[in-house]
Amino acid sequence: MANKNFSLTVYDSEYMETNNKIYQENMEKKIRTISEFPDKVLLKILSLLPSKDVVATGVLSKRWRSLWKDVKTFRTSSVESLQLKINPSATNKDIQSLVNMAVARSMRELRIEMICKNFELPKSFYMFSQLETVILDKVSLMDPPPDVHLPCLKRLHLLSVNSLTNVMIFTIDVPTLRILSIDNTSGKSRPKGVHGFVINTPSLSVNVVFDNPYKFLAPLGSTQYLSLCSVTSHTTYRPAVFSFIFLDHLELCLCSAEQWNLLTRILNYAPRLRVLQLKLYHKHCVKDTKNLMGNQPDLIPKSLSSHLEILEWRQYNDTAQEREAAKYILANASGLRKATFYTESTEKHGMLKEVRMCGQRFKNMSACVK
């Protein structure tokens, strides 16, 4: 049965084009009319709109391009991340109000990037924050409390961060923390004296890039994943004993000849180490393999003899020093299941043959050179 109420209207292309043109002209007229209002009125109107729509007005015309930046009130219910790139002329009061806003709105992520600017974070940041990710970049903290308690924090990145106070040891009591990144190799501002950390963070994944990583290793006994980069071969402080009984995965940057000594020390105190990765982390890292082998340990570390399953070596150049280090690991890692070497050398076939010879007594081991 046919539908008696059905109707179909067809417009030709000329009609549609004319209709669209009229619509565009009307919109442009409205924009011109609104743009004739003084800035004070326009800012009042913008302050009543959601922040997303306020920012979108920047494409209307040259005048609107920067007008939205003068809006003082932000209206939103779904923002979870705040990134602040702060001009050195900003005052502590300005910064604290923004951080307090992030805490009050229960934001999940906060990033503060500054250049040689000293400021004091509000107490609410340290005690009442719901933040899960905090990134501080090129920041000098004034009067940080010795004890930091962030109940929801999962990821903490301290990039060229220092303190202007006499506090030399910071306690990070964050049981929920899963990723900690400390990098003090960039920027002109550096800490004076020996700054250290006491860290209470079960199941932690740690990335340390510092001029002397020994400062940070002692309190990281509960860590399961550790990533290390040392930019100097000079170590002035070494704790007597490390304890990495939970360490499962170790990444080590090869930009310092000291790294082999560091590796052998960690292997001695990481009996459950299962994955070992050797590589260069950053563009500024330059491989230093002089005296890479150093003094081989008298006793084969337990982690090598029984637990190590995966070896991955990137930027492998097959130098004499690297070859000796690889032979030592392959010859003693009786539980090794997979060894992978990444190289730009054209002698990959010969390298693979040598690798297999070193580990030929281990029936379950597979080796490849890429």
From Swiss-Prot:
InterPro entries in alphabetical order: F-box-like_dom_sf, F-box_AtFBL13-like, F-box_dom, FBD, FBL13/AtMIF1-like, LRR_dom_sf
CDD domains in the record: F-box_AtFBL13-like
Superkingdom of origin: Eukaryota
Coiled coil feature spans: none
FBD domain location: 292-343
SUPFAM superfamilies: F-box domain (SSF81383), RNI-like (SSF52047)
A Pfam family this chain is assigned to: FBD
UniProt domain F-box: residue ranges: 31-77
PANTHER family to which the protein is assigned, alphabetical: EMB|CAB62440.1-RELATED, F-BOX/RNI SUPERFAMILY PROTEIN-RELATED
Designated name of the protein: Putative FBD-associated F-box protein At1g50980
Species name: Arabidopsis thaliana
